[in-house]
Amino acid sequence: MSPKRRRLMAAALGACVALVLPLHAGSAQPSTAKTPERTVFEVTASTPEARTRVARTGVDVLGQDGDKLTVVAEPRQQWALRATGLRVENLGDYDAQLQALGKVDFTDPQVGTQDFPSGYTGYHNFQETVTELNQTVTDHPNLVRLSSVGKSYQGRDLWMLKLSDNPAVDENEPEVLFTCNMHAREHLTVEMCLRIIKQYTDGYATNPTIKNLVDSREIWIIPMVNPDGVEYDIATGSFRSWRKNRQPNSTAVGTDPNRNWGYQWGCCGGSSSSGSSETTAARRRSPPRRSPHPHFVNTRVVGGVQQIKTHIDWHTYSELILWPYGYTYNDTAPGLDAQQASAFSTLGRRMASLNGTRRQQSSDLYITDGTINDWLWGVHKIWSYTFEMYPKSSSPGFYPRDTVIATQTQRNDSAVELFLSYSDCVPRIIGRTC
């Protein structure tokens, strides 16, 4: 930990405990209390169809634990949430809960302008992530190459690390892509990408399994897909629970980067057209907003063959492993046959057995469209998974203390190793060839 972080004020407020306040048909007394701008609710939704009804109201779905969805609703969305007919329980003022997690003391000269509150300083902000990547290049110049896939809306470089035994050469080897922090508030995912980088560089000289995987693969790692959103989430010194990027659309600021991929985009009610919704895609009558990340994937088609074979998109939270399709409840659909679905589910099940999470097709959670998993598979036949990391439930939700970083990233080591081992030919896991 840097000296700057050790000198941060230690008097930040402790983690909040949300009060469970059930909704009643009537109220006992009129209240003069100000209506919260955002309220947390727990919704009982035991089927994918019920969860999809909730998601289509435009509320911010935070996570799932069993038959419970934790969501955040603005006042104008609450009537639609109640209209679903599902059991809804009020868990309190969301912004008050975020404030109670702590606030940075910007009067401390050692504190940067973009930093995490006390108890969270082990997380990397954008500049610290860049510093970490540059240090990796210095420490392992023969294993890594750092480049930018382009610029964010606000002009930040979208850094990507290539990990290979010959990083300056485009070798004829299966390529693997890891993406982290697509959603701004999911800070633990940056640490996951940095964990993979550290493990497969520092371990190269001493671990034969790691050496074999690095020697036989080209691994691309993008630790912070959405740096503008990340910096906005922590800019005030308290967490904002910001999900989207910072690119303006016609009605508000921000588009959900994981509802903005072109395959089956906007087809099935899997994202909101409301500008304030946390799953807002670009306007339905216009194409998805351009992003450098799909362009990079397209450039990996060499001689008519896509070089990237597999992909994991890291998210929090709910402790799930998901695979395509998200736009349909069907296990098979155009471009995804029974054998391919079996390979997806078999590898997903094997990985889940190693990190102790649940596994399911994406739409078994609820319908989504315009996602990276559906696009990578539907357009490029890249075996693409989402890992929803720790925690399982809304406590502590998106903001676990930094004391969990080591344990909750190391938890995925064996699953990542298995994933890389099958990245030359995923159907091998069901006894098929490529």
From Swiss-Prot:
Its cofactor is Zn(2+). SMART domains: Zn_pept. Binds 1 zinc ion per subunit. Belongs to the peptidase M14 family. Its EC number is 3.4.17.18. It catalyses: Releases a C-terminal residue, which may be hydrophobic or positively charged. Pfam families: Peptidase_M14. Carboxypeptidase that possesses the specificities of both mammalian Cpase A and B. Thus shows broad substrate specificity, being able to cleave Cbz-Gly-Leu, Cbz-Gly-Val, Cbz-Gly-Phe, Cbz-Gly-Lys and Bz-Gly-Arg in vitro. Residues 270-295 are annotated as: Disordered. Residues 1-33 form the signal peptide. InterPro entries: Carboxypeptidase_T, Peptidase_M14. GO terms for cellular component: extracellular space. Residues 122-423 form the Peptidase M14 domain. One of its GO terms (biological process) is proteolysis. Keywords: Carboxypeptidase, Hydrolase, Metal-binding, Metalloprotease, Protease, Signal, Zinc, Zymogen. Residues 282-293 have a biased composition (Basic residues). CDD domains: M14_CPT. This is Zinc carboxypeptidase. One of its GO terms (molecular function) is zinc ion binding. The active site is at E388. It comes from Saccharothrix mutabilis subsp. capreolus (Streptomyces capreolus). Residues 34-114 form a propeptide.
